[in-house]
Amino acid sequence: MASPLRSLMLLLAVLAVAWAGTSRPPPRLLGAPQEADASEEGVQRALDFAVSEYNKGSNDAYHSRAIQVVRARKQLVAGINYYLDVEMGRTTCTKSQTNLTNCPFHDQPHLMRKALCSFQIYSVPWKGTHTLTKSSCKNA
């Protein structure tokens, strides 16, 4: 009788250890950056602002626009910090043109230019303000 009880206790101990070792997602820390959907309205506004600032700061004759958002994160602070990793591409639209929405990317090798950029945008939605707090790009 003691042997089956001992076996049952051993089995329960093994199961308890196995259950304790299973991976669980770590608890989310309040105020820590979290992943965001690139199609989210706030992310899109932050992206548009960052691209606009990128083009203002560029001495290129052509506008650039986002090819894709590689990663988007957001952090709730006294507003919202958006952290965006973006692949940028040079378009055929010159700086004198204002509408970038339909600007195709250059396809001629000597005019093509791509960059990987990291933008940090501080947004206060209830005030309607955006600030580009950090920006770094490297040729892709």
UniProtKB/Swiss-Prot annotation:
One of its GO terms (cellular component) is Golgi apparatus. It is found in: Secreted. Keywords: Disulfide bond, Glycoprotein, Protease inhibitor, Secreted, Signal, Thiol protease inhibitor. The keyword Glycoprotein applies. Transmembrane segments: none annotated. Coiled coil: none annotated. GO terms for biological process: cellular response to hydrogen peroxide; cellular response to oxidative stress; defense response; embryo implantation; eye development; male gonad development; negative regulation of blood vessel remodeling; negative regulation of collagen catabolic process. A motif (Secondary area of contact) lies at residues 75-79. The record marks 31 as: Reactive site. Glycans are attached at residue 99. One of its GO terms (molecular function) is peptidase inhibitor activity. SMART domains: CY. SUPFAM superfamilies: Cystatin/monellin. Residues 1-20 form the signal peptide. PANTHER family: CYSTATIN, CYSTATIN-C. Belongs to the cystatin family. This is Cystatin-C.
